[in-house]
């Protein structure tokens, strides 16, 4: 997993609580796909935080960009929105994620993007990458009001150019509109199904990409399932993934011992010395390796704890584990033995992992 140090190119204020950061990455270019995300690491008031943010730019853009919306109680999102202009350099790893646009499908069929709030970021990247096609993409977007809609001006321009169809749901109580595709209030299953049947020509052949708050995403999915849309045509990315279901794998109920190779820093004569350490730790049944390592005092970088950010990766050299979620890992990483510690449950007593 590649690491980058990028500088701030410019900051654009999208709404009162949302900014887009454009990075100067000319010296350290990244290869990514529309829909993928980055991990950002910041030291905020002495606390090291790592968070994941989707790229809202496309690979052909001169400057890669992320769009950050303030989240209630979110330390990093609030800090970025308030202080982005004062951040000169950014520690970045990535790209991550398998929530990507299938360009062949976009060239041949209509694509429907279903967004809520800051979930527009990866979908906006997909939208910009579609380009000219005989099938006009459709965006279904739930927001509070036009003033609080991220990318409002850009989306309005695309709609005026007839390169994009949009149906909004505006949830602010004071919102009133006579436009057919500006719906006051929250989407309902009935309204969503009506919108899709009205605006999508071949609903069963169309592919649907969904991103936003969990409850809204589930509503979108339920509406599509109710229209008999094939499961393989529904693509989703949860910003806050739910905990892995531990009922789907069996264990013998025994505590397993795991060998962990890791690295520790120590000061010697005012200089940092790094030492390779090997620890034998006990892992309880249905206990993730990440939790067990922290219990045994092993320093492990982590963030999401649900397999979506990729921060807590390690290399498994022997043994068998159960890894229910691995959204952050491409197939080639899994084949190479890379695991996510927050999602790694040892099934045998010969598991060995190495922290990088």
Regions from the PLM with identified roles:
Residues 131-138, 319-328:
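Phosphate-handling active-site elements
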Residues 235-295, 311-316, 344-356:
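Redox cofactor-anchoring modules in respiratory/redox and cofactor-processing assemblies
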Residues 2-89, 93, 109, 143-145, ...:
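Ferredoxin-reductase
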Residues 1, 7, 226, 231, ...:
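Iron-sulfur (Fe-S) cluster-binding modules
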Residues 79-262, 267:
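FNR/FR-type flavoprotein reductase catalytic core
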Residues 122, 294, 298-322, 333-348:
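Local cysteine-cluster metal-coordination motifs and their immediate loop/turn environment
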Residues 59-63, 104-107, 346-356:
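Ligand-binding loop in jelly-roll beta-barrel domains
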Residues 68, 114-115, 143, 211-212, ...:
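Small/polar loops that bind or transfer phosphate-bearing groups
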